[in-house]
Curated annotation (Swiss-Prot):
Alphabetically ordered keywords of this record: Ribonucleoprotein, Ribosomal protein, RNA-binding, rRNA-binding
Single biological process term from Gene Ontology: translation
CDD domains: KOW_RPL26 (cd06089)
One GO location term (cellular component): ribonucleoprotein complex
Molecular functions per Gene Ontology: rRNA binding; structural constituent of ribosome
Gene3D superfamilies for the chain: 2.30.30.30
Protein name (Swiss-Prot/TrEMBL): Large ribosomal subunit protein uL24
Annotated family: Belongs to the universal ribosomal protein uL24 family.
Length: 108
């Protein structure tokens, strides 16, 4: 399934235990329909010692969440701190395909 969200887009979580949390997309996994969002769904992984890693460690990282649980946040200007949750559409302008925030109608 094609996704309209991209890396470094600002999103808000709209469902789940992190509902209302804002963050930026670190990674998009289109085949699994998931995204990794900074500061959301942080899990702890215990790494065993190995030849390459002589000491074991405990690492925290963001696990991916389903793409339907996030919404794009469109900021109208540099002073706009909160932004508006909006869907994304595409339009052709001057032989280029551009992303547009549906609520504001502005190019992303």
């Amino acid at each position: 399934m094609k996704t309209k969200l991209r890396k470094n887009d600002e999103v808000i979580v709209i469902a789940g235990s992190y509902k209302g949390t804002k963050g930026t997309i670190l990674k998009v996994l289109p085949k699994q329909q998931r995204v990794q969002v900074k500061g959301v769904n942080v899990v702890t992984k215990h790494v065993k010692p190995s030849q390459s890693n002589s000491e074991g460690s405990i690492q925290n990282f963001e696990a991916p969440i389903h793409i339907s649980n996030v919404a794009y946040v469109h900021k109208s200007g540099p002073k706009d701190k909160s932004g508006i949750a909006s869907k994304i559409s595409y339009e052709k302008r001057k032989d280029k395909k551009v992303r547009i925030a549906r609520k504001t109608g502005k190019v992303i």
